[in-house]
């Protein structure tokens, strides 16, 4: 129960990092935190295969989007816009976590009782659907992400000319 509370707080922190700042560097950090913690939450619920496949898809897609956003950014020295909001939120999260560890917050309703009984279900329930009839769609999706990454890397390679970078 305490693990899920910590994961949900980390998910909330990642969402605030994503929303508060306009710099793509911190936005990519927020997306990575949100995707990792979201996949850990799915893993804690018992779906290990779905968690792994979503993690690979999220990180592959985010690599392309982050490369494109940093190619177009004009920010040489990114700063956090709202430092006070992040500090107050971190203090609030620490208070909630310590209250939860002290036993003052009771939220056990039996939904997460599987965490105490043995952890993760290792069944491959989603493998048949992902690799059955839709294998060609997965291959084309991976090739599309790879092609987009190559295009973005070609755009960022020409940093000395064009309107993409300010030097």
UniProtKB/Swiss-Prot annotation:
Enzyme class at the top of the EC tree: translocase
Record flagged with keyword Glycosyltransferase: no
Cellular component aspect of the GO annotation: mitochondrial membrane
Primary localisation category: mitochondrion
Transmembrane stretches, start-end: 24-44, 54-74, 85-105, 135-155
Molecular function terms, GO-annotated: NADH dehydrogenase (ubiquinone) activity
Catalytic reactions on record: a ubiquinone + NADH + 5 H(+)(in) = a ubiquinol + NAD(+) + 4 H(+)(out)
EC number, as in UniProt: 7.1.1.2
Location within or outside the cell: Mitochondrion membrane
Domain of life of the organism encoding this protein: Eukaryota
Keywords: Electron transport, Membrane, Mitochondrion, NAD, Respiratory chain, Translocase, Transmembrane, Transmembrane helix, Transport, Ubiquinone
Membrane topology recorded in Swiss-Prot or TrEMBL: Multi-pass membrane protein
Family the entry assigns: Belongs to the complex I subunit 6 family.
Protein task: Core subunit of the mitochondrial membrane respiratory chain NADH dehydrogenase (Complex I) that is believed to belong to the minimal assembly required for catalysis. Complex I functions in the transfer of electrons from NADH to the respiratory chain. The immediate electron acceptor for the enzyme is believed to be ubiquinone.
Protein's recorded name: NADH-ubiquinone oxidoreductase chain 6
Organism: Myxine glutinosa
Protein's gene: MT-ND6
């Amino acid at each position: 129960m305490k693990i899920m509370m910590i994961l949900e707080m980390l998910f909330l922190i990642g969402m605030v990092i994503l929303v508060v700042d306009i710099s793509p560097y911190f936005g990519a950090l927020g997306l990575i935190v949100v995707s990792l913690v979201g996949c850990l939450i799915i893993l804690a619920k018992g779906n290990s295969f779905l968690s792994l496949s979503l993690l690979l898809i999220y990180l592959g897609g985010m690599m392309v989007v982050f490369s494109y956003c940093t190619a177009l950014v004009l920010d040489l020295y990114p700063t956090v816009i709202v430092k006070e909001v992040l500090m107050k939120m971190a203090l609030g999260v620490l208070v909630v976590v310590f209250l939860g560890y002290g036993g003052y917050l009771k939220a056990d309703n039996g939904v997460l009782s599987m965490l105490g009984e043995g952890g993760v279900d290792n069944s491959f329930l989603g493998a048949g659907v992902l690799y059955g009839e839709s294998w060609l769609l997965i291959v084309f999706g991976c090739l599309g992400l790879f092609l987009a990454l190559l295009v973005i890397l070609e755009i960022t390679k020409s940093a000395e000319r064009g309107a993409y970078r300010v030097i």
